[in-house]
Amino acid sequence: MYRIDTITDNMLEDYFNKYAIKVKNYMIQLLNGKITIPGELGTKNKILIKYKVKKDTPTWHFLNKYAQDANLHKLLCGSWEELLEIISDVESLIPNLEWKKRATKAEYNKKKYQIDGIDTDGSKFIDHFNEIMHWLFVDTMYENELDKLQFIEKLGLKICPYCGRQHINIAKLSGHRASKPNIDHFLPKSLYPFLGISFRNLIPCCYVCNEV
């Protein structure tokens, strides 16, 4: 991979100022139990669930820590060294890499997850770090909030940083949506969903490299 040398301090600050408030607001709502995330476990005899942050769980401690501006800045705009420190922090909160697994019905039946009551519709509340992080940073922030076209334009890359051969220009035609390069998560969002919109983890790349 080729080094991306177009990143500037001003670019990082603009990125933080644009997205930090939204992320922080979601974090606070999760901490206060105001957001529940619908889901289900199993294919037959499905269990209706709602993911919800329970106080003093690892999920709660992570959100409480990284909702603070200095830590949130590291999460969104930190160097690679700082992102690796965040991963180590998560591993210390949740040992044995359990946070990387998605919730399963079998593990639920073994009472592996924290049950936090039953909602009025009969859905059971569980606190599962990976599922909640994926909803916040991938489903909500990356898919719906992140202005991907603006992000790519500001970086100003012309050649794919992975292969160094394919062009990744943005094509704009009057009356048509702009055609933009793919954005790859260098550290995969399936394993590290909390880095879903971390600036340095977002790599504009060509179609071929994104499919590898």
Where are the language model's segments positioned?
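The −1 position to Zn-ligating cysteines in a subset of zinc-ribbon hairpins
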Residues: 159, 182, 205
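Short secondary-structure capping/junction motifs at helix and strand boundaries
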Residues: 123, 143-145, 170-171
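Short, cysteine/histidine-rich loop/knuckle motifs that typically chelate Zn2+
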Residues: 161-165, 208
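Histidine-centered nuclease catalytic patch
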Residues: 167-201
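Short Cys/His-centered divalent metal-binding micro-motifs
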Residues: 202-212
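Short, flexible, mixed-charge glycine/proline-rich loop motifs
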Residues: 146-156, 194-199
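Short Cys/His-rich Zn2+-coordinating modules
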Residues: 135-148, 184-191
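N-terminal accessory alpha/beta regions
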Residues: 1-140
